[in-house]
Amino acid sequence: VIGGAKCNINEHRSIVLLYSSRLFGHTLINKEWVL
């Protein structure tokens, strides 16, 4: 995680922001996890 900040585990559970480029890919594992 680049530029992340700590927060309570129950805060913002559904917010995900992805910056995509041709060098990286993202996979949605389930409704709570992005790899």
From Swiss-Prot:
Q: Which GO terms describe its molecular function?
A: serine-type peptidase activity; toxin activity
Record carries keyword DNA-binding: no
Hydrolase: is it a keyword of this entry?
Answer: yes
What pH dependence is recorded for this entry? Optimum pH is 7.9.
State the signal peptide span. Answer: none
Q: Which residues cross the membrane?
A: none
Instruction: List the EC numbers from the record.
Output: 3.4.21.-
How does temperature influence activity?
Answer: Optimum temperature is 45 degrees Celsius.
Question: According to its UniProt record, where is this protein located?
Answer: Secreted
Q: Which UniProt keywords apply?
A: Blood coagulation cascade activating toxin, Hemostasis impairing toxin, Hydrolase, Platelet aggregation activating toxin, Protease, Secreted, Serine protease, Toxin
Q: Which GO terms describe its biological process?
A: proteolysis
Activity regulation note: Inhibited by diisopropylfluorophosphate (DFP).
What is the role of the protein in this entry? Thrombin-like snake venom serine protease, that cleaves both alpha-chain (FGA) and beta-chain (FGB) of fibrinogen. Partially degrades factor X (F10), and release bradykinin from kininogen (KNG). Potently induces platelet aggregation. Shows a proteolytic activity towards protein constituents of the platelets cytoskeleton. Hydrolyzes actin, actin-binding protein, and P235. Shows a preferential cleavage at Arg-|-Xaa bonds.
Which family does the record assign? Answer: Belongs to the peptidase S1 family. Snake venom subfamily.
Q: What is this protein called?
A: Thrombin-like enzyme cerastobin
